[in-house]
Amino acid sequence: MIELDYLTIAFGGAIGAVLRYLVSRTINSLLPFSYIPLGTIIVNSVGSFFLSFLMFAAIEKVPLSKEAILFFGTGLLGAFTTFSTFTYETLSLIEESPARGVAYALANLLFAFTCAYFGMILGRGKV
């Protein structure tokens, strides 16, 4: 039922968006001296880990229902991670300092892909 799919995604997305706001705001307030927005790096990395873990575990070990994938993958983790904030912050930092902006972009990608890789390994049960 398509309408239920939308509600499932919306409910997961609402939770993910609030969690992202809380985590990112908390990290950035604890580390106000940081030269880059660490909150975004952390939410993107954590979200990448859990999405990879969820999807690889669902494919190879424990089949998940369509509703669980929509709720956790598309909804919660989709809203928890934030590509748009990452790109905005990168451009803002590049305007201030090109080196800092590029370093931020590379750090975000490096940490997110590394966490996604470990999520894949753990999701497949290789550890």
Curated annotation (Swiss-Prot):
The keyword Signal does not apply. NCBIfam families: crcB. Its main location: membrane. It is found in: Cell inner membrane. Coiled coil: none annotated. It is a multi-pass membrane protein. InterPro entries: FluC. The chain crosses the membrane at residues 4-24, 39-59, 68-88, 102-122. Na(+) binds at G78, T81. It catalyses: fluoride(in) = fluoride(out). Belongs to the fluoride channel Fluc/FEX (TC 1.A.43) family. The keyword Transmembrane applies. It comes from the Bacteria. This is Fluoride-specific ion channel FluC. The gene is fluC. Fluoride-specific ion channel. Important for reducing fluoride concentration in the cell, thus reducing its toxicity. Pfam families: CRCB. Keywords: Cell inner membrane, Cell membrane, Ion channel, Ion transport, Membrane, Metal-binding, Sodium, Transmembrane, Transmembrane helix, Transport.
